[in-house]
A protein has these predicted regions:
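Membrane-interface loop-to-helix entry segments
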Residues: 1, 118-123, 140-189, 194-202
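Membrane-interface "cap" regions at the ends of multi-pass membrane proteins
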Residues: 1-31, 75, 246-248, 252
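Flexible loop linkers connecting adjacent transmembrane helices
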Residues: 1-12, 36-46, 58-90, 281-288
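Membrane-interface alpha-helices at helix entry/exit sites of multi-pass transporters
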Residues: 7-12, 42-51, 84-88, 92-100, ...
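Select transmembrane alpha-helical segments in multipass membrane proteins
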Residues: 10-21, 92-107, 145-148, 210-230, ...
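Helix-loop junctions at the membrane interface of multi-pass solute transporters
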Residues: 25, 34-41, 67-73, 104, ...
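Helix-loop-helix module between adjacent transmembrane segments
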Residues: 52-76, 82-83, 87-117, 121-156
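Extracellular/periplasmic helix-exit of transmembrane alpha-helices
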Residues: 62-70, 75, 182-200, 208, ...
Length: 288
């Protein structure tokens, strides 16, 4: 039986922590990232991305379990993550602080910038097709998109973790299930192509030239890089959400977060099948 305390109203449930971490995993890495991986490495990159998910789930389990073990508690709930277990577990305070600073900079200027760039690029494609005399940059749409994203980010940033958890627990399942449903429809409509697509993935994954031809750009390396970018296993972001969950045993949250990697893999496979059915990768357009 879990011990109840006065801070429970600020705690995340294991499901809410799962949805927060899934929200960070479900994004451009699952859609544009898949397209870029297939264009750069061929259909076989999808195979290595899936294989990386099995290895990544172990990383997700370990980092989330450690986040639960070394978390701390205050009046706003639980706090933890890699910075905390580096400091409290390894006893290296400066390294934990450095990790926290690098993670903040990476997400503020790297991941968020890539998300907004991809969204803006998608709008630009359709804007150019409309044939307007005003360029996309002059239209003010890029600034408008940036302001909208900034507003949503600010709301989440200044909200308490349990509020973010509640919002994510409603939005993320709907978002993920809707996308998977659309992918299933696409697969059903192209049912006859499934054997050929699977054969193409396997042959490309183990093609000698694709594996060893310029190893830094080989199908294996591309698949692994895109897989890690998509599922975020071992990157140190998901454990921050995992630490905020109120659970009876650290391992339970570790298992929940490991499952999130397989949810991400399912969405990646769905995106990959859509790209391969359409043969859009042959145009060398990455969608980024």
């Amino acid at each position: 039986v879990e011990k109840k305390d006065k801070y429970n109203k600020h705690h995340l449930t294991p499901f809410q922590a799962l949805m927060i971490s899934t929200a960070s995993r479900f994004g451009i890495g699952n859609i544009a990232g898949i397209s870029a991986a297939i264009v750069a490495g061929g259909p076989g990159a999808l195979f290595w991305m899936c294989l990386m998910a099995f290895l990544g789930s172990a990383s997700a389990f370990i980092e989330s379990t450690l986040a639960q073990i070394y978390k701390t508690k205050d009046v706003f709930g639980f706090k933890g993550g890699p910075a905390y277990y580096i400091k409290n577990g390894l006893g290296i305070k400066w390294l934990g602080s450095l990790f926290a600073i690098i993670l903040i900079i990476t997400y503020a200027y790297g991941f968020n910038g890539l998300q907004s760039y991809t969204m803006t690029s998608a709008f630009e494609i359709y804007y150019d097709k409309a044939g307007s005399n005003i360029t996309f940059a002059q239209s003010g749409l890029p600034i408008g998109i940036g302001l909208i994203l900034t507003a949503f980010t600010a709301v989440m940033f200044f909200s308490k973790s349990h509020i973010i958890g509640k919002v994510s627990s409603y939005i993320v399942p709907f978002m993920a299930l809707t996308y998977i449903l659309l992918a299933i429809i696409a697969i059903v409509l192209n049912f006859k192509e499934i054997p050929a697509v699977i054969k193409m993935i396997i042959e490309s994954a183990f093609d000698f030239k694709a594996i060893f031809g310029g190893f830094a750009g080989s199908v294996i390396v591309i698949g692994i890089k895109r897989g890690l970018f998509s599922n975020e296993a071992g990157m140190g972001s998901a454990p921050n959400a995992a630490a905020a969950a109120h659970t009876s045993h650290p391992v339970k949250q570790g298992l929940v977060q490991a499952m999130a990697v397989f949810i991400d893999m399912t969405i990646c496979v769905a995106s990959g099948m859509i790209v391969l059915f359409s043969q859009a990768y042959l145009t060398k357009q990455t969608g980024v």
